[in-house]
């Protein structure tokens, strides 16, 4: 499987307009691209007028053909003007979903944007976070506007919006190259999916008036109207969805279900990286967030190490898990940049991560990764000599190099970021061990060890391996993993280490004081003992010396017995969990015969979940990388907004996935 896409091949004509070499067509009008956007798409969908009467907190636009981003810039600017003029309006956020088969190179984007200096700030932000050439959804935040940029063929990506997005899109920009130039895109499958995902009274607008396009949209169910065309074009089309068509859910057992809220009152149980990232995404949407942490301070468990590596898990045999981590890695870097911009202080270094082929098994894994066709800034195989140069110390093996990898101080990051969130209104309650959850008519009651009770509309469980302590979650197939990370003094040799070094363990570069490194970590499943282990301390040292087998490794000295033990939460398939908490007993009753229900094509119930109860779990050893995108995904689900991941990834992260796989095979779930 490949995860990458190709760049667009373009040139600029005499009018300085970009022209596609693949499709032999201009990206926007030779006359006035911005005026065309305004007339065809903004006016064609009557956006300003509809925003005035809109009663929901978010408005969703989808677009075929991102191109230079001109349409996105124009609608983002218009929405900013709307928000400035209507500060107290219920409409707060704009979601813009766009599909692009051949993304432009950064240099081409820059040149194309020179014609529109009024979008200079938007252009700079887009260029800063312009994604690597990875298939799928890339979420980029522009204040109150969120861009979901899907790289790849729209015929493959649009279905990946999935059942969740049925009737959630308010307006369509049906753009792209002309039907005569790109006939593969303009087809009935596209029109039918557009209709399926469009809300009742949702609209579309397009620059073309081609007869086949009009008939296809009408056949899908839209009421189509001809308008005067822009410039020299005689006509263009717009349309309205008046009546719904019932659409059978393809995977009802995985359907994500938003919260039912009036006050946006959310409790998060847990005090680590998962809780933090969920809180960040929630407060951006206006939620009132309360954190319940059982420890006396935040980030004392799995998120409490002094140094941790930030890089994607690419060696999984499950392509959907790899796909998730590729996008989580990109989104996580965006969150770290946001934290730096907010002056949240935490030690970090964007130094790259080296993955050593220290034995035959690891060499095979890295070779498989190299065959995924990933961009070089994500992964590339290097010789021992090349890798040694990157690392700063001699190695005797080849390996993988992740240029954008980093290390950061997890505890410092979590604690200081939470301090920042407190100033934004987040309430933090430490020394609050929640022992029971009781469902109310509207929300949940939380009970602590002292018998005190708290009520909230929505509850998120993000308390690591203790997530199964509740009656509602005790059936989830999660387990704890003990890990001891050693802190070692630096030396003249170790100070030369320039990147994170991974083998059957990991070693970080020196901290910012240049006094110590972290090396780890032991792994013991179903072990929650937090006591220091001298044996594990020695094993952390021995693994490095055995795997790397270079003289400089003898400088590693764990005899000070400085170490930290944390308990991670994991699951057998090693993918995280995010979303609704499934109601096991009800799902067991609904799906025990799922194999036969599907075979007989009988009606199947949507997943029975606990209303307004959600989770982020099983982050394992990659929480720094996965938590930001998991938190953003969960906030999107809670608010009923478009998701930053594909339907396939969502299914792979669903908490009931292990049960469903058995039910689909006709097997029992105990």
Curated annotation (Swiss-Prot):
Its main location: cytoplasm. It is found in: Cytoplasm. Its cofactor is FAD. It catalyses: 5-aminomethyl-2-thiouridine(34) in tRNA + S-adenosyl-L-methionine = 5-methylaminomethyl-2-thiouridine(34) in tRNA + S-adenosyl-L-homocysteine + H(+). Pfam families: DAO (PF01266), Methyltransf_30 (PF05430). It comes from the Bacteria. GO terms for molecular function: flavin adenine dinucleotide binding; oxidoreductase activity, acting on the CH-NH group of donors; tRNA (5-methylaminomethyl-2-thiouridylate)(34)-methyltransferase activity. One of its GO terms (biological process) is tRNA wobble uridine modification. Residues 1-242 are annotated as: tRNA (mnm(5)s(2)U34)-methyltransferase. The keyword Methyltransferase applies. Its EC number is 2.1.1.61, 1.5.-.-. GO terms for cellular component: cytoplasm. Keywords: Cytoplasm, FAD, Flavoprotein, Methyltransferase, Multifunctional enzyme, Oxidoreductase, S-adenosyl-L-methionine, Transferase, tRNA processing. Catalyzes the last two steps in the biosynthesis of 5-methylaminomethyl-2-thiouridine (mnm(5)s(2)U) at the wobble position (U34) in tRNA. Catalyzes the FAD-dependent demodification of cmnm(5)s(2)U34 to nm(5)s(2)U34, followed by the transfer of a methyl group from S-adenosyl-L-methionine to nm(5)s(2)U34, to form mnm(5)s(2)U34. PANTHER family: SARCOSINE DEHYDROGENASE-RELATED, TRNA 5-METHYLAMINOMETHYL-2-THIOURIDINE BIOSYNTHESIS BIFUNCTIONAL PROTEIN MNMC. In the N-terminal section; belongs to the methyltransferase superfamily. tRNA (mnm(5)s(2)U34)-methyltransferase family. In the C-terminal section; belongs to the DAO family. This is tRNA 5-methylaminomethyl-2-thiouridine biosynthesis bifunctional protein MnmC. The gene is mnmC.
């Amino acid at each position: 499987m490949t995860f990458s896409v190709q760049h667009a091949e373009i040139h600029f004509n005499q009018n300085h307009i970009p022209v596609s070499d693949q499709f032999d067509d201009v990206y926007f009008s030779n006359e006035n691209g911005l005026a065309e956007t305004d007339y065809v798409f903004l006016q064609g969908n009557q956006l300003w007028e509809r925003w005035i009467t809109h009663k929901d907190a978010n408005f969703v636009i989808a677009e075929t053909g991102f191109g230079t981003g001109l349409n996105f810039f124009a609608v983002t600017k218009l929405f900013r003007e709307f928000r400035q003029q209507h500060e107290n309006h219920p409409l707060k956020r704009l979601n813009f979903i766009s599909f692009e088969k051949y993304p432009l190179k950064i240099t081409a984007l820059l040149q194309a944007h020179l014609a529109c200096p009024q979008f200079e700030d938007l252009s700079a932000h887009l260029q800063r976070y312009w994604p690597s050439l990875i298939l799928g959804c890339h979420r980029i935040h522009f204040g109150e506007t969120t861009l979901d940029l899907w790289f790849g063929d729209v015929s493959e990506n649009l279905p990946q919006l999935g059942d969740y997005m049925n009737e959630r899109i308010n307006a369509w920009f049906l753009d792209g190259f002309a039907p005569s130039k790109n006939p593969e895109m303009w087809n009935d499958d596209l029109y039918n999916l557009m209709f399926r995902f469009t809300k009742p009274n949702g609209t579309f607008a397009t620059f073309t008036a081609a007869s086949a396009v009009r008939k296809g949209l009408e056949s899908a169910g839209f009421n189509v109207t001809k308008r005067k065309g822009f410039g020299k074009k005689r006509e263009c089309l717009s349309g309205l969805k008046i009546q719904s068509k019932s659409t059978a859910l393809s995977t009802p057992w995985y359907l994500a279900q938003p919260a039912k809220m009036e006050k946006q009152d959310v409790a998060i149980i847990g005090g680590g990286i998962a809780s933090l990232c969920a809180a960040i995404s929630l407060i951006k949407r206006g939620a009132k967030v309360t954190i319940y942490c059982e420890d006396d301070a935040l980030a004392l468990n799995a998120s409490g190490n002094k140094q941790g590596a930030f890089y994607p898990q690419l060696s999984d045999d499950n392509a959907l898990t790899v796909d998730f981590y590729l996008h989580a890695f990109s989104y996580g870097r965006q969150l770290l940049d946001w934290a730096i911009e907010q002056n949240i202080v935490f030690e970090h270094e964007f130094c790259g991560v080296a993955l050593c082929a220290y034995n035959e098994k690891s060499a095979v894994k890295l070779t498989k990764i190299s065959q995924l066709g990933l961009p070089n800034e994500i992964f590339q195989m290097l010789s021992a000599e090349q890798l040694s140069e990157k690392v700063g110390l001699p190695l005797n093996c080849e390996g993988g190099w992740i240029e954008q990898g980093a290390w950061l101080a997890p505890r410092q990051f979590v604690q200081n970021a939470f301090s920042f969130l407190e100033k934004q209104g987040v309430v933090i309650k430490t020394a609050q061990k929640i022992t029971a959850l009781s469902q109310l008519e509207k929300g949940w009651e939380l009970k602590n060890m002292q018998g005190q009770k708290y009520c909230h509309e929505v509850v998120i469980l993000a308390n690591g391996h203790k997530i199964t302590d509740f009656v509602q979650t005790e059936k989830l197939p999660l387990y704890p993993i003990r890990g001891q990370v050693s802190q070692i003094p630096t030396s003249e040799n170790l100070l030369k280490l320039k990147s994170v070094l991974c083998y059957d363990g990991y070693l970080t570069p020196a901290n910012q004081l240049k006094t110590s490194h972290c090396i780890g970590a032991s792994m013991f499943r179903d072990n929650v003992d937090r006591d220091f282990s001298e044996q594990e301390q020695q094993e952390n040292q021995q693994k490095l010396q055995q795997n790397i087998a270079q003289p400089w490794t003898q400088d590693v000295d764990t005899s000070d017995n400085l170490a930290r033990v944390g308990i991670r939460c994991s699951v057998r398939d090693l993918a995280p969990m995010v979303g609704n908490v499934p109601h096991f007993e009800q799902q067991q009753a609904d799906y025990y015969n799922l194999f036969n229900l599907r075979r007989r094509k009988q009606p199947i119930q949507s997943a029975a979940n606990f209303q307004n109860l959600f989770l982020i779990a099983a982050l394992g050893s990659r929480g720094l990388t996965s938590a930001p995108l998991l938190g953003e995904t969960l906030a999107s689900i809670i608010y009923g907004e478009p998701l930053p991941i594909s339907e396939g990834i969502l299914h792979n992260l669903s908490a009931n996935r292990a049960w469903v796989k058995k039910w689909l095979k006709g097997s029992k779930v105990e």
